[in-house]
Amino acid sequence: MDNKEIYKAVLGMIDLTSLNSTDTPSKITVMTGKVNHFHDSFPDYPLPASICVYPNFAKTVAAARENPDVHVTVVGGCFPASQSTLPVKIAECTAAVSDGADEVDIVLALNSFLEKNYEAARREIVEIGSTIRTINPAVLLKVILETGALQEKALIEDASYLAMEAGADFIKTSTGKMQPAATPEAAQIMCDCIRTYHAKTGRMVGFKPAGGISTPEDALTYWNIVSNTLGKAWLDKRYFRFGASRMANNLLSALEDRPVKYY
């Protein structure tokens, strides 16, 4: 594939994201409307994989979207700090799925993980996952490792395996709310773990880099890591996503050879 073919494919892997304190139902409805009418302006390019918002906007996106192939993703479990009690996290995620969320991105409980209380961190993922799947068995659970807080290879490996063994459908680098966010180094470690886990279990776990990803060059970097480490089977939105707010316009600009500010 040449670079433009990759840019086009990546457009269809983006979780188009708005996670701002100033988000309103009107703003989220406008963003969803742009996705609905994307093919009016760009008929040859794919729609984003999902629209990613705070949990209180799950119902807004679900009501406004016209194509169910564009999923409703929420960040849940008291994102981005994950600092609350498990019942509160479960309640938030459950409400979002009841409101129409197809995917839930939660943050690994670093308050437990960094204290080496791995069972508590694992239990949160298991209980959130099992509860939301009683509402929608097809719901996807992504677990954010916040690799910028871990940094050491061994910690990123431990967090990756813990999340996958607890039932994560995807592991995700970062919330985007702290620095460093996604890095190629962390992505490589996580993809190595996904490959090893798949070899042992046969289960394909997805990978989602997020945070600070905005350029076509970023897209190529993470595409190549996934392609070279995990192979062609992972080059599909079922197993590979990008968390991004600015990258869609930048990819469109690169594809069109002109400045594009559609989203």
Regions found by a protein language model. Give the residues of each.
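Alpha/beta enzyme core
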Residues: 2-46, 56-207, 214-245, 253-263
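N-terminal beta-loop-helix "entrance" segment that forms/cooperates
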Residues: 250
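Short, hydrophobic beta-strand segments that form beta-sheet elements in well-ordered domains
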Residues: 51-53
